[in-house]
């Protein structure tokens, strides 16, 4: 059984169908890239999976459970986390605190504990700080040395890495990354590819939206291509890159993607 099974999924905004009867199966341990021209429906798909949008029709089955009507916080608690195309860190919190924010769905201490700070709450917070530092260490020396600095002081690339670390803080099984290498130079991009592979090797499944086709070809186990909300191709990166429908969707003429 697929970890995530998207069945006949449609999402309409008035008369516009952003997703049209989409089928997609994501197996545990895969890195799958979702690509397509601007307006293809990629971010809409992520918004549906993460519970920001409720699908017009179809099913979104994760670990055997239909998530289609669950709110975003419940989907996070089930084991799905995401980053966003536009960076959403808390600039006036420290790097460490930003990661700890991502752990809220796993906290055992309730509202009374937040006010009265019993020993159990203090122990839990100490454990979360240790875990947050472990997550920062996944990114080498990019984040951990800045753990006590405000996130506003991070470089653009490191703010993107911080978003990934915060998403990992909720202990997901499926991680959705929306353009994780956007704005990065080639060296930063190569480093991020290695870090995403390392995350997969920790037992996670990764679904990526990415516009840099060199990244897609390098990192993906499989590639799914959307155009106007319809899946037009799916398969191994090399096969998809040479698919005439994909070339037409991107370039409108005979060419080869690279």
Q: Language-model segments: what does each one mean?
A:
Residues 1-258:
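Glycine-rich phosphate-binding loops of nucleotide-dependent enzymes
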